Amino acid sequence: MPLYHFDLVNTKTILDEGGAELHDDIEAMDSADTIARRVLDERPDLKDRHYFILVTNEDGEEVFRLPLEIIH
């Protein structure tokens, strides 16, 4: 299974060092949504500060970008 990374990005990047092995890009996008919701549960102050979850594959290519602002 491919390895995906989920970094929290604003002016600085908090890297996902370990990543997660997932079936495909769709599952990675679903995981990004789960991670974003968890981040906002723990740090609601980040919602309106232009943070996003950057999903990359094992080759470092961007798969998806999920702005925290759109999470309800």
Regions found by a protein language model. Name each.
Residues 2-4, 18, 49-51:
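A generic structural signal for short beta-strands and their flanking turns/coil linkers
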Residues 38-72:
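Short, mixed-charge low-complexity intrinsically disordered segments
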Residues 24-44:
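A short, charged, amphipathic alpha-helix used as a generic interaction element across diverse proteins
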Residues 10, 18, 42:
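Glycine-rich, flexible loop/turn motifs
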Residues 14-25:
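A short, exposed loop/beta-hairpin motif centered on an aromatic-Gly-Thr core
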Residues 1-15:
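Short aromatic-glycine-(Arg/Gly/Cys) micro-motifs in beta-strand/loop hairpins
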Residues 1, 24-27, 58-60:
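A short, structured loop/turn motif at beta-sheet edges
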